[in-house]
Amino acid sequence: WGKKSPTFTREGVYVDGESNLHMAMVKKGDDYFSAQLQTGAVVYDLPKDSKGFWPFGKFENPKFMHKFGYYECRCKLPKNNGWHAAFWLQAPGIGSHPDPKYGGVEVDIMENYRQAKEGNIICGCGWGGSEWFGHVAFPYVETEDGWHTYAVDWSEEGYVFYADGKVVSRQMAPKCAVSHVDEFILLTTECHGYNRIFGNESA
């Protein structure tokens, strides 16, 4: 959304021998950094090409884009308070068209920044021109082995969100804006928000 978090890093990431991707918090000096995985980019986040007239960066070919279908992540959530993790979908040209059907909609399948203080996970999507805008909070329930699955079933009619196999929210048109354009996937972590700290400030 216009700028990248200054605490993103390419360090602290590895794949173990069981096909699990690990993202570890990395300390540099007096601050902490963490990584993210994304298969595309928002146009506004690309570094500006100084030779271009318009304030956009050089277009980057996405690694994976798709529209409609079932998207699922199996994960363990961060153990440190203040460490924000999310699984979401985004459109490269979000905000570029007055109708989100053509410009895209941010779809937050799972965000855990309320977990430490409120014991909740949130999901949802929204757009300022729709009747409904915002997120739905649902209780975080620990599993025996610590693994969780978060998912969304995205169709032309809307979105159905799942947590550990259970439906936690249904957001359907016309109350909810529905994207009809290809979007990319993000699995992200942030030690700090863009303009604020999530959870425990010590993290």
Give each language-model segment a name.
Residues W1-A203:
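GH16 jelly-roll
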